[in-house]
Each structure stands twice: as C-alpha cells, then as structure tokens.
Amino acid sequence: MKYKFDYDINESGMLILKGLAFRNRYVEVPREDRFRKLYSYILIDIDLSYALEFLVRGINMYDDIDRICYFQMAVIKYSKCYSPSKKDGRSQLSATKVYKGIEEDPIGCHNKFIEMRNKYFAHDENDFKASKLGAILNIDERKMMGIAYPQMQAKFDYFETIAILMKLCEITKNWIGEELDKEIECVRLYVEQRGFDKLNGYKDLKISNTWGLV
C-alpha cells in the first residue's frame, strides 16, 4: 500500500518527515538489482502524472504554440514509459500487458504515439521527407526568379488527439498503480527482515539536485 507523507528538505538535502506521531528517521536502503522494477515503476508513475498535467494544460491553452509544446512534452513523457533504456536504466512497460483486454484498439493508438514521438518530435524523419523546395518562375520572361521553401511542419487535430492520449495515460497509470502496490509490499517484506538495528544503521536519506551543466 502506498502512503503519502509531508516532508521538508533541510540545507544538507536530508528529507524530514512531518506529521508523524512518533520520533522517526528516514533512512536510505542501499540499492539492489532486485529493486529495479520498483524504481522503474516509481519513475513511470511520475512521468505519467506529468503527461496528464501537460495534456490538461494543453486543452486549456488558447495559444497554438503553447498547446503544441504541452502536447509534445506529454507524448515524450508517455513514450518514455514504453521505450527501452540503457543497460542500467529503468525497465520498460509492455503495451501488450498494459492494454490486455481493453477494447477499441488501444495498442494501435499507442503505436501511433510512439511513432509520433520517434518521427516527429524526438527526430524529424517525417518532416524531413515531407520538406519541399520550390522554384519561382517568371512566365513572361521565361526565367527563374528565385528559390523558395514553404515553412510547413506536420499538424494534428490536437483536441481529439489529446483526448486519446489522456485515456492511454490514465489506463497505464491505473495499471502502474496496481503493480506498484504489489511491488512495494514485496520490497517491504524483504527489507523488514533485516531488523530494526540494521536498518537504523543506514544513512539518512538525502536528495541532491542532479540537474545542471556544471
């Protein structure tokens, strides 16, 4: 079972849990390969939460540029959940498992979004293939006056497409929620066997900001 706690982060990056009726420490359990699925599901759940928030904001945007930005970010976040990672990265989801028994061809829609991410957003394969070059001709003087290219890129019916992606995100998030509950319980039982004294010997859990260019 998942619980949510309020917390503060002190100057050293240590997390301080709030609102508990007992003295507590929040200790960091050393990483193990057997926790990989749990780490992966946690990250996927976070990505899906962001994707859904981006989609909601995209629907409420009046400006096309803002809507496109939120939509593209949502597609990229969703696709990450199903995309293979490097050797030591997160475990990817299987669309076949997640959408098993769901009607209305969710896997077909899912594949379209993965293709959209790969060919339009992360790369420009389709836009490159669709790029056109034109020559402007002066018919009367029978000569070319210059070269021009239309500034066009792929467009989508954003409102309908957002609704479809939102449904896929919700289905995936529900599936992840159930799997997270199972995985958390397995990990809890495994870690609890170590006993209080061993666990109390672990370091306080700290977080650090890993973003940045330096």
How should each PLM-predicted stretch be described?
Residues M1-K112, D127-I136, R142-V214:
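Amphipathic alpha-helical interface segments
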Residues N118-A122:
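Long, charged low-complexity segments
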